[in-house]
From Swiss-Prot:
NAD-binding protein involved in the addition of a carboxymethylaminomethyl (cmnm) group at the wobble position (U34) of certain tRNAs, forming tRNA-cmnm(5)s(2)U34. Homodimer. Heterotetramer of two MnmE and two MnmG subunits. Keywords: Cytoplasm, FAD, Flavoprotein, NAD, tRNA processing. The keyword tRNA processing applies. Its cofactor is FAD. Pfam families: GIDA, SAM_GIDA_C. This is tRNA uridine 5-carboxymethylaminomethyl modification enzyme MnmG. InterPro entries: FAD/NAD-bd_sf, MnmG, MnmG-rel, MnmG-rel_CS, MnmG_C, MnmG_C_subdom, MnmG_C_subdom_sf, MnmG_N. SUPFAM superfamilies: FAD/NAD(P)-binding domain (SSF51905). It comes from Mesomycoplasma hyopneumoniae (strain J / ATCC 25934 / NCTC 10110).
């Protein structure tokens, strides 16, 4: 790597600011493209840390992690190596919403990533704080740090999470700090404001942690799980041998009384917090106020590491003062003698308005500047990692002079996530839900590999050989489906007796029945589950694919980049405002902007058609 004599500055292809889940994925994506990268982080021992729950996956989120893996990312691989428990969620609700969730040894996870990154060529890890982006003629060319270092690069990816001008809040205390007592980065926040970026205040929180030795496990319910032979990563061979349990208990009437009596002491309810919190992960104070009719709320004890010395108290996120936290904790069965290892807190921070972004996650204002993760208004490790991977891919494409990679809504939850952010924006921490995806029957846990394959190949994150291997897998499934359609079970066969068949039926039709175990028909076929899902959902899949094609046609209708929306006749005032702010690239994007109605789209289409006719008439 070439060093410049002035200011000890160094030239790189890309700089990644922040070593959280988004930053790590961005780094790996860039390294896979053979680019020279510097990662600037506050503490390299806390790479991809888990300051909130020690888990990866869950409804929709687990599918995102599978997509990250299929796209060439690393979250799934490292989760498999660090997991202490893994399970399926929503098994009874069908394959469209089936997802994986794993408890992670958070310390091991960070150590594995640091160890692996130390082996990587073309990577320099710096412990520092970014103070200023270097921008000239609306293009980023490097940055300065708090330690007076200067780095030049062709692109910069900001993945600062909840650290920008962040405050940790507990009771009446408001301390300038990042999560886990780390330094806040108000210098970068102020710099972004000076560059004209629109920032907003958001809030999240975390519960207290309890020393395991102080818990009375005789008063709580132990989660008993089978040993699932599953992984996040399609490539992983690591299997968990023993499931470490979580535990369930509940709040009590006494818990609720203490919270109600002390609401005014909560940072959230005292007016100390101005940021908007996550709708789908409310604090215990919010639960008691919003759901006052409920006599109790679930509380889960989740081990933070394999040592199991500290438990994360899921469901008890709070910004109460320490004395109130201790008082309410002791009213929960199993925690009467609890000793708190770390008190809960709320954290308020600056986040970018994601309408400032293109679908590539490059900013509209500054070329070569990309944003990913919680800085874009999302919540969750999985959502952050997905954005980091996409930003890393597209920063690499930018450096190499190639077109950006943009994942469509019908191809992945990652596509839904980014499309929602850049077309609708968000005023609260955005969490991925299966209900946000209109094509969720085709965005399943089992088929993430084939859905992401073309994007991974285009990105250069998988080889042509790996791509063809995935294609061969599904070709094999298609051939087996054809075979089963030609093979029949008669009423005299043993299989017919097991399932009370009264007439001859094809094996394909039989396997599509919900009560049939596919292993009875395909005992040795390695992709039996995938085939069964395809057989059972065939009609629904065809319908959603047809609907997706309509969406794709709208995506192909481009909107001129210099279009003057004020000249579009009969647009609603809200549509005009949103179009000018978002500046959608396609009619498809325009149609998904909140507040835009079908009449606005018709007016826009008509205006573009007139412009095209005027151009033709001038020729």
């Amino acid at each position: 790597m070439s060093k410049k004599s002035k200011n000890s500055s160094i030239e790189f292809d890309a700089i990644v600011v922040g070593g959280g889940h988004a930053g790590i994925e961005a780094v790996y994506a860039l390294l896979k493209k053979k680019l020279k990268v510097v990662l600037i982080t506050l503490d390299k021992k806390k790479l991809a840390s888990m300051p909130c729950n020690p888990a990866i996956g869950g409804p929709a989120k687990g599918i995102i992690t599978r997509e990250i893996d299929a796209l060439g990312g690393v979250q799934g691989k490292f989760s498999d190596l660090a997991m202490i428990q893994i399970k399926y969620l929503n098994e009874s609700k069908g394959p469209a919403v089936l997802a994986i969730r794993a408890q992670i040894d958070k310390e091991k996870y960070s150590k594995l990533i640091l160890k692996d990154l130390k082996k990587q060529e073309n990577l320099l890890i710096i412990e520092d704080l970014v103070s200023e982006l270097l921008v000239e003629k609306n293009r980023v060319f490097g940055l300065k740090t708090a330690k007076k270092q200067v780095f030049f690069s062709k692109t910069v990816i900001i993945t600062t999470g909840t650290y920008m001008d962040s405050k940790v809040l507990r009771g009446s205390l408001a301390i300038p700090s990042g999560p886990d007592g780390q330094q806040t980065s108000n210098l970068l926040s102020n710099n972004l404001k000076r560059l004209g970026f629109e920032l907003q205040r958001l809030k999240t929180g975390t519960p207290p942690r309890i020393f395991t030795s102080s818990i009375d496990f005789s008063k709580v319910e132990k989660e008993v799980l089978p040993v699932y032979n599953i992984n996040f990563s399609f490539q992983s061979k690591h299997k968990i041998k023993k499931q470490i349990s979580c535990y369930l208990t509940y709040t009590t009437a006494k818990t609720h009384d203490i919270i109600n009596k002390n609401l005014g002491k909560s940072s959230m309810y005292s007016g100390l917090i101005s940021g908007v919190g996550p709708r789908y992960c409310p604090s215990i104070e919010d639960k008691i106020v919003r759901f006052s009719e409920k006599p109790r709320h679930q509380i889960f004890f989740e081990p933070e590491t394999k040592k199991q010395d500290i438990m994360y108290i899921n469901g008890l996120s709070t910004s109460m003062p320490e004395d109130v936290q201790l008082e309410m904790v002791k009213t929960i069965p199993g925690l009467e003698n609890a000793k708190i290892a770390k008190f809960g807190y709320a954290i308020e921070y600056d986040a970018l308005n994601p309408l400032e972004l293109k679908k590539s996650l490059e900013t509209k204002k500054v070329k070569g500047l990309f944003m990913a993760g919680q800085i874009n208004g999302t919540s969750g490790y999985e959502e952050a990692a997905a954005q980091g991977l996409v930003a890393g891919i597209n920063a690499g494409q930018f450096v190499l002079g190639k077109k950006p990679v943009e994942i469509l809504r019908n191809d992945g939850y990652i596509g839904v996530l980014i499309d929602d952010l850049v077309t609708k924006g968000t005023k609260e921490p955005y969490r991925m839900l299966t209900s946000r995806a209109e094509y969720r029957l085709i965005l399943r846990n089992d088929n993430a590999d084939i859905r992401m394959a073309k994007y991974a190949l285009k990105s250069g994150l998988i080889s042509k050989k790996e791509y063809l291997k995935i294609k061969a897998k599904y070709a094999k499934i298609d051939r087996k489906i054809l075979e089963l359609s030609k093979e029949f079970v008669s009423p005299k066969d043993e299989l017919a007796k097991k399932y009370n068949l009264e007439k001859r039926i094809s094996k394909l039709k039989l396997i599509s029945w919900p009560n049939v175990n596919f292993k009875d028909i395909l005992p040795d076929f390695e992709f039996g589950y995938e085939l069964t899902v395809m057989a059972r959902l065939k009609g629904y899949i065809q319908k959603q694919n047809s609907e997706a094609q309509k969406m794709i046609r709208l995506e192909k209708l481009l909107i001129p980049g210099d279009l003057n929306y004020e000249k579009v006749a009969n647009l609603s005032s809200e549509a005009l405002d949103k179009f000018q702010k978002v500046r959608p690239k396609t009619i498809g994007e325009a149609s998904r902007i909140s507040g835009v109605n079908p009449a606005d789209i018709q007016m826009l289409l008509f205006h573009i058609k007139v412009l095209k006719m005027q151009k033709v008439s001038k020729i």
